[in-house]
Curated annotation (Swiss-Prot):
Organism classification: Eukaryota, Viridiplantae, Streptophyta, Embryophyta, Tracheophyta
Organism: Atriplex nummularia
Disulfide bonding pattern of the chain: none
Limits of the EF-hand domain: 22-57, 58-93, 95-130, 131-166
Positions contributing to Ca(2+) 1 binding: 35, 37, 39, 41, 46
Location relative to the cell: Cytoplasm, Cytoskeleton, Microtubule organizing center
InterPro entries: Centrin_CML-like (IPR050145), EF-hand-dom_pair (IPR011992), EF_Hand_1_Ca_BS (IPR018247), EF_hand_dom (IPR002048)
Name of the protein in its database record: Caltractin
Keywords: Calcium, Cell cycle, Cell division, Cytoplasm, Cytoskeleton, Metal-binding, Mitosis, Repeat
Amino acid sequence: MSSARTVRKDKPRGRHHGLTQQKRQEIKEAFELFDTDGSGTIDAKELNVAMRALGFEMTEEQINQMIADVDKDGSGAIDFDEFCHMMTAKIGERDTKEELMKAFRIIDQDNNGKISPEDIQRIAKELGENFTVKDIQDMIEEADRDRDGEVNVEEFLRMMKRTSYAY
């Protein structure tokens, strides 16, 4: 037997290793519930209802794009594995966005919905960083699209999306 043909047993099987068993079960139940014709697949209309039930509001174009992204046979419908793969990505996006929202609220000390230069100075000091006024001004200008001198939540999320924290 050639060592090149040895199969590794410790490798995770399947495409769903990023999900908890409970989350996978919820996705399976949603799939079965919304596979209304019992075909073993979900079409665009069924997917839209399933996504809303799982807490995602989506446009018809987004639904059709999601199907196109995972529909390997071009049938216009997706099976459970495709649905699970797609939902793993969507849940990851939502979790990352929730984490970014928590970070925004921590930085926005006065809870006015905007990150000010003072907010950045305070959090930097708490983290042991020492930024100059110019450093902070540059950070704000990088993200501040409406040019009000502060960073609102949309600007913050857009900025973070351009970095390694993409959601």
